[in-house]
C-alpha cells in the first residue's frame, strides 16, 4: 500500500512539474512576443503557479478513506499478529504452565489487543502490561455456573446413594457392636447366678460301722 502511494505521488509530482514548466515557457514566449510588439508583459496567472510537492491529494484521499487501517499500521500492539489474509490473531503466554494460549482471530488489531488485555489481567493481575492501560476497569466476578436439570438430578441421586451407603455401614457396625455387648452381658449373668459346686469331704481309709445302720432280724 505504501509503495503504491509513493509511486502515485511521484507520477503526480512529475506531471505537475511538467505542466508548470510548459506553462512557464509558453508565458515567457508570449511575453517576448508582446514585448516585440510593444505590449507590456502581463504577470503569470496564479493558476500556472508551481504545485507544492508537500501537498499530496492522493495521500489525503487514502487517509480519509481508510483512517482505521492507517492508525493500526502506525501502532503495534502487544500479543497481536496479522495473518497473511488480513485478520489479526491474539495470543498470550501463560506464566503458570509456560505455554502459549490462543485467544482467537479478530477483524481489527484493536479488538485483538483488547482480548490480550483481558487475558493479561486474568493471568497477571495488576502486574500485567496492557495495550490500553487507560481503559483498565475492575472486571466483574464471573456469573455462577448454572447447572442443567439433568446434572442436578444426577448429582442428587449420587448424593442419596452415598448417604444410603454411609447409613448402611453405620447400622452394620452398630448391630455388630450391640450383638457382642449382648453376648458379653449374658455370659457374665450366667457366671454370676450359677451355683458353685461344694467340694466333697475327704473319705476315711475304711468303711465305718457307725455310718451304716444295723440290719433288722425277722421275728420268729
Curated annotation (Swiss-Prot):
Gene3D superfamilies: AP2/ERF domain (3.30.730.10). Disulfide bonds: none annotated. Keywords: Activator, DNA-binding, Ethylene signaling pathway, Nucleus, Transcription, Transcription regulation. The keyword Nucleotide-binding does not apply. GO terms for molecular function: DNA binding; DNA-binding transcription factor activity. Its main location: nucleus. It comes from the Eukaryota. GO terms for cellular component: nucleus. The keyword Transcription applies. Transmembrane segments: none annotated. Residues 57-72 have a biased composition (Basic and acidic residues). Residues 15-36, 48-72, 176-220 are annotated as: Disordered. GO terms for biological process: ethylene-activated signaling pathway; positive regulation of DNA-templated transcription; regulation of timing of transition from vegetative to reproductive phase. Residues 19-30, 205-214 have a biased composition (Low complexity). It is found in: Nucleus. Residues 76-133 bind DNA. Probably acts as a transcriptional activator. Binds to the GCC-box pathogenesis-related promoter element. May be involved in the regulation of gene expression by stress factors and by components of stress signal transduction pathways. Belongs to the AP2/ERF transcription factor family. ERF subfamily. This is Ethylene-responsive transcription factor ERF110. It comes from Arabidopsis thaliana. The lineage of its organism: Eukaryota, Viridiplantae, Streptophyta, Embryophyta, Tracheophyta. The gene is ERF110.
Amino acid at each position: 500500500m505504501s509503495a503504491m502511494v509513493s509511486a502515485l505521488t511521484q507520477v503526480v509530482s512529475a506531471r505537475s512539474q511538467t505542466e508548470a514548466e510548459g506553462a512557464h515557457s509558453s508565458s515567457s514566449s508570449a511575453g517576448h512576443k508582446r514585448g516585440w510588439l510593444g505590449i507590456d508583459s502581463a504577470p503569470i496567472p496564479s493558476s500556472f503557479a508551481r504545485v507544492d510537492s508537500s501537498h499530496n491529494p492522493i495521500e489525503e484521499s487514502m487517509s480519509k478513506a481508510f483512517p482505521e487501517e492507517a492508525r493500526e499500521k502506525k501502532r503495534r500492539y502487544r500479543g497481536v499478529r496479522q495473518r497473511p489474509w488480513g485478520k489479526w490473531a491474539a495470543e498470550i503466554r501463560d506464566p503458570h504452565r509456560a505455554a502459549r494460549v490462543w485467544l482467537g482471530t479478530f477483524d481489527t488489531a484493536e479488538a485483538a489487543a483488547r482480548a490480550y488485555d483481558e487475558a493479561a489481567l486474568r493471568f497477571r493481575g495488576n502486574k500485567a502490561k496492557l495495550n490500553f492501560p487507560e481503559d483498565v476497569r475492575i472486571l466483574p466476578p464471573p456469573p455462577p455456573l448454572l447447572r442443567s436439570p439433568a446434572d442436578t438430578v444426577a448429582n442428587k441421586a449420587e448424593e442419596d446413594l452415598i448417604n444410603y451407603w454411609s447409613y448402611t455401614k453405620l447400622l452394620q457396625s452398630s448391630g455388630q457392636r450391640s450383638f457382642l455387648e449382648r453376648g458379653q452381658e449374658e455370659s457374665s449373668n450366667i457366671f454370676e447366678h450359677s451355683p458353685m459346686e461344694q467340694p466333697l469331704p475327704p473319705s476315711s481309709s475304711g468303711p465305718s460301722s457307725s455310718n451304716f445302720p444295723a440290719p433288722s432280724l425277722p421275728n420268729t
